[in-house]
Swiss-Prot record:
InterPro entries: RNase_P/MRP_Rpp29_sf, RNP1, Rof/RNase_P-like, Rpp29/RNP1. It comes from Desulfurococcus amylolyticus (strain DSM 18924 / JCM 16383 / VKM B-2413 / 1221n) (Desulfurococcus kamchatkensis). It is an enzyme of class 3 (hydrolase). This is Ribonuclease P protein component 1. Belongs to the eukaryotic/archaeal RNase P protein component 1 family.
Length: 92
């Protein structure tokens, strides 16, 4: 299944480019990078300089760049959960 704006909440996020649009820590707003790890409640983003930042999904608004170039804005609360459990939630 290819990732698109309709299924991003159920798709693998590792490897996607991301930008933080809203976050409780204002110093992280605007941070861009690639998702390199994901847990139940967090994402690890690697910036172009190689710095890794762990952020909580809850209370964040994120913009993901899909492989086809489309930008998708999503609330972090919609992607809370273990990656493999979210993948199981896809309707067949």
């Amino acid at each position: 299944m290819r990732v698109n704006s309709r299924n991003i909440a159920y798709h693998e996020l590792i490897g996607l480019e991301v930008r933080i649009l809203q976050y409780p820590d204002p110093s992280l707003v605007g941070l861009k990078g690639k998702v390199v790890d994901e847990t139940l409640k967090t994402l690890v983003i690697e910036t172009p300089s190689g710095r890794r930042v762990r952020i909580f999904k809850f209370n964040s608004i994120l913009e993901f760049m899909l492989p086809d170039g489309e930008a998708v804005v999503i609330k972090g609360s919609t992607i809370i959960g273990r990656p493999w459990d979210r993948l199981k939630m896809v309707s067949r």
